[in-house]
Amino acid sequence: MTGPSTGPALVVGLGNPGSEYERTRHNVGFLVADVLAERVGDRFAVHKKSGADLLQARLDGRQVLIAKPRSYMNLSGRPVAALARFFSVPPTEVIVVHDELDLPFGAVRLKRGGGEGGHNGLRSISSALTTKDYLRTRIGIGRPPGRQDPADFVLKPFAAAERKEVPVIVEQAADAVELLLRVGLEAAQNQLH
C-alpha cells in the first residue's frame, strides 16, 4: 500500500485483554482502535471465527475492518491471520497499531515491514501471516528507566505526567491510521515524518 488502495484493509490495535491491562503502555493499540470506532460511530462485536473484537466500517468508500484480538499479545498472530483470511485482506493491507520502545514517548511513525524489535505481538503476527511485509503504526512509549526490564515496563501503567498526554497521542495515532488508509504509506510518511 504505497499509494492509496481500494481493497479491504484490516487495522489491528494490539493489547492484552482484561481490566488489569487496560491502562498499560502495551495496550496503546487498543486505545487507538477504540478512538477509530468512536469516529465511525460503531461498536465492536465478537467475531467468533477469529477470536477478535471487530467492527466493519467504510472510509471514503473503502471497506475497513478494525480489530482488537481477544488473545494475549504474544498470541495476536492467530486472530490477525484468521481475519485476513476470512475477509480476503492481503498482508500488505494489514495495519498493526502497537507500542514501540525504540521511539520516544509520544512519537508516531508509519512503516512497512522490518524487524519486530523484541515485540512478541509483532513476532506472532509475522509468523502467522508468514511475512513481515505488513504496515505498522508505531506509537513511542520510550525506554524503561534505569535497569527496569522492558517486559515489566510495557505492562505498567503510564506515569502520571504521561497520562495527561496519552489522549492526544492516541488521537494523533488514529489520525495517522486514517491518513495511511486515504493516501497510502509514502504520502502519509511525507506528511507525518
From Swiss-Prot:
Site (Discriminates between blocked and unblocked aminoacyl-tRNA): N16
GO biological process, one term: protein quality control for misfolded or incompletely synthesized proteins
Annotated EC: 3.1.1.29
Residues noted as binding tRNA in the record, renumbered to the chain: Y21, Y72, N74, N120
GO MF entries: peptidyl-tRNA hydrolase activity; tRNA binding
Subunit structure of this chain's protein: Monomer.
Role summary: Hydrolyzes ribosome-free peptidyl-tRNAs (with 1 or more amino acids incorporated), which drop off the ribosome during protein synthesis, or as a result of ribosome stalling. Catalyzes the release of premature peptidyl moieties from peptidyl-tRNA molecules trapped in stalled 50S ribosomal subunits, and thus maintains levels of free tRNAs and 50S ribosomes.
PANTHER family named among the record's database cross-references: PEPTIDYL-TRNA HYDROLASE
Protein name: Peptidyl-tRNA hydrolase
Organism: Nocardia farcinica (strain IFM 10152)
